[in-house]
Amino acid sequence: MAVKRSTRLGCNECSEINYLTFKNVKKNPEKLALNKFCSRCRKVVLHKEVKRK
């Protein structure tokens, strides 16, 4: 069975956490980075995986 863990994506410019997604930790051990819309910046910017607390 695949191990999927929830990950949070934070804006690279304003550091706000905007998205929650799931990824397979065994297949993709590196950090996730996606271009997404930030409602605070009001533009499409890079969102990177934020460290879990």
Swiss-Prot record:
It comes from the Bacteria. PROSITE patterns: RIBOSOMAL_L33. It holds the Pfam family Ribosomal_L33. The keyword Transmembrane does not apply. One of its GO terms (cellular component) is ribosome. GO terms for molecular function: structural constituent of ribosome. GO terms for biological process: translation. Keywords: Ribonucleoprotein, Ribosomal protein. Belongs to the bacterial ribosomal protein bL33 family. This is Large ribosomal subunit protein bL33A. It comes from Mycoplasma genitalium (strain ATCC 33530 / DSM 19775 / NCTC 10195 / G37) (Mycoplasmoides genitalium). The gene is rpmG1.
